[in-house]
Design a protein with these regions (language model features):
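Acidic (Asp/Glu-rich) sequence patches and key acidic residues
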Residues: 1-99
């Protein structure tokens, strides 16, 4: 299963979505402080965020060190790329919903 972060802009104006495995998203939800910004229950369809909260989430993720096995095994280079994709989306989106 996977999780897809979708920009809240109208269709045709949205930035590209970010899709990731459930485990990858659940680890993001478990970052300290994330619970003050969004619903961190491990259900894939409950989370939404405003643009301001999305930017705060990006700051938390940027300073976070993912656990081994986070995405693509223990490939630290890939971990940094995935963090970059997620943070870039969160900084540029007009808020998001999860599908």
């Amino acid at each position: 299963m996977s999780v897809c972060l979708i920009d809240k802009r109208r269709r045709g104006q949205q930035i590209p979505s970010v899709e990731m495995p459930n485990h990858t998203w659940f680890c993001v939800l478990d970052i300290d402080g994330m619970d003050t910004l969004i619903d961190t229950r491990h259900y894939c369809d409950t989370t939404t965020a405003t643009p301001a909260k999305a930017k705060k989430m990006a700051a938390l993720i940027e300073n976070w060190t993912p656990p081994d096995g986070w995405c693509n095994g223990n490939d630290r280079d890939w971990h940094e790329k995935m963090k970059g994709y997620i943070c870039d989306f969160l900084r540029k989106c007009n808020g998001f919903r999860v599908m």
